[in-house]
Amino acid sequence: MDEFQRNSNKHRSWQQFFLYPLFFREDLXAIAHYHHLDRSGSSEPTEILVSNFLSFLTVKRSXRRIRKQNNSISLLGNSDSNKLIEYNKNSSFQLILEGFTIVLEALFAMRSKXFXKGMDGWNSFRSIHCIFPFMEAKLPHSBYISDLRVPYSIHPEILVRIFRRWIRDVPSLHLLRSILHEWKKSFNRENLQKALITQRENTRFSLFLWNSYVYECESFLIPLIKRILNSQSLLYGSFPDRTHFEKKIKDIVLFPPHKISPKKIWLLKDSFIHYVRYGERSLIALKGTHLQVKKCRYHLFHFWQYYFHLWFQPYRICSLELSKTSFSFLGFFMHVKMRPLVVRAKMLDDLFITDLITNELNSTAPIRSILFSLAKEKFCDISGWPISKLSWTSLSDDDIXDRFDRIWXXLFHYYSGSINQDGLYHIKYILLLSCAKTLACKHK
């Protein structure tokens, strides 16, 4: 893959215009075959591994036959002999899809690097461990927050149009269109709207589609929001701490002089924005006025409706004032709380005591949701009373204790920074008593 990316940098025009011949190279099909075996693992029976290898040979022979044909042949035909459209049953389709994804991933990696270099003034963090320190440092200084859910109901033709912006190879686009439409047919009608995006954890191709879709959204969304904030500064009332005045109201000639109040000074308010995303949830923290928040919300609605040609449900974006309401993100309930501090300042021979008020971000663990999950997994009843885990009674004592210990350690490590530690110890009590009842039920 590294060698392919280095060669593609030298011949970028060839890479963009002639991708279709790469999909039928035998070495690319071999790479896809080994990727498919590594993901399946070595625990599969020998018959399945042999079947996959034979399918690889079938794809290899098909690629040779297609190269020798003069007429164009559709890989996804409806003939009885060609079973490539059987997405869940035939691994030949998986290998072709794997090779198709490998080529597109290399192009996507180079395109995303160019996008990151062009975003001046924006710091990008790609680890979940950076989210909480970032939010604790930035959100207390923000006024509003917009909770945005990325739309997942998207038509295959919209994805084809996204790839058309950076791939101009017409045969490759036709192949992508055929794959997307045949893949969409493999889902029933109930899951038709969520087939392309919400199944992203199943295959490498699904994950690539999701990353491409989110990248396309953010590549236009972030500059759009930045342009909205920098387009026009909004005026607001007098603040005595500001010494650098942009304009005074007496200098404005749009109003008669007798209607101007000399006691009120109008200043320009500085605005900034922070953007955080995890999965399909995005948070846009904004320091500014309520009018700027409404303006940003208006442009977000029209961005998805006119750019992606899909209806953006109003409930998918919610604007909140941080000082009055709380919000949920990554399994926490978060709210900004004012914290009063008493500061002693000494100037020459005098000692002053001043009150300083700062904002801090408090996170609360959702104890009720955790109890509901434990009740669903039969660790306790709906009221929170511990019960024995009957499905684990066939395990050894060490395995039972180890499983309970891992559950508690995972919960404690994730929610250890929350302010409601009493609720976490109540969860620990439920797990300990459920473990004891499970062991007692086993040795009864």
From Swiss-Prot:
Keywords: Chloroplast, mRNA processing, Plastid, RNA-binding, tRNA processing. The keyword RNA-binding applies. Pfam families: Intron_maturas2, MatK_N. GO terms for biological process: mRNA processing; tRNA processing. InterPro entries: Domain_X, Maturase_MatK, Maturase_MatK_N. GO terms for molecular function: RNA binding. Signal peptide: none annotated. Its main location: plastid. GO terms for cellular component: chloroplast. It comes from the Eukaryota. It is found in: Plastid, Chloroplast. Usually encoded in the trnK tRNA gene intron. Probably assists in splicing its own and other chloroplast group II introns. Belongs to the intron maturase 2 family. MatK subfamily. This is Maturase K. The gene is matK.
